[in-house]
């Protein structure tokens, strides 16, 4: 996967994305991620890879200072159309090269983005950089099982799935290890499909 290809494939995905990833099991999973989260009035939130804005619909947007970025202009248009009455700033931006100052945000939401970007370690590095001290990164994504080899079938289909803009063979532990001195995992729980999808909360 690379950014150029991701822009192409998510242009294709944008008209139908919500049918697959903001309904049914995925909608239930997203709600489960946000159900027990609370935000303080005026907090600065950054949605990295906001997509069509599915997560924006699950929070009280009026009391928060929200910025949302995505590499795909087509996905951003979908997100902004859902949030016309809220003061959210939308930017087309590479999640691996965030154009924000250090320690700018209280909370970062990263749903289905680490498994999409070409360099997930760079993405996490950038999120850590722009996160304030004592801030949190909330991750909802699919990862390979901890300390287990990827099942044979997934190893076979992984290259094909990557063509559609995502990676089913990513180990979160491999991404996180480099930043374990500055970040702490507060929560890591299975959310969907026997733990393939997880909710992970990281604190700086």
Go through the PLM ranges and name each one.
Residues 121-133:
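A short glycine-rich, Lys/Arg-flanked "PGG" loop and its adjoining helix->strand segment in the class I
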Residues 199-204:
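C-terminal lobe and adjacent flexible extensions of AdoMet/dcAdoMet transferase-like proteins
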Residues 4, 20-23, 138-196:
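C-terminal alpha-helical "lid/dimerization" subdomain adjacent to the S-adenosyl-L-methionine
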Residues 1-40, 54-58, 78, 82, ...:
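Conserved class I S-adenosyl-L-methionine
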Residues 44-97:
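Class I SAM-dependent methyltransferase SAM/SAH-binding core
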Residues 107-119:
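A short SAM/SAH-binding and catalytic strip from SAM-dependent methyltransferases
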Residues 96-107:
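A short acidic, Gly/Pro-enriched loop at the edge of an enzyme's catalytic core
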Residues 44, 134-136:
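Short glycine-centered segments of the SAM/dcSAM-binding site in methyltransferase folds
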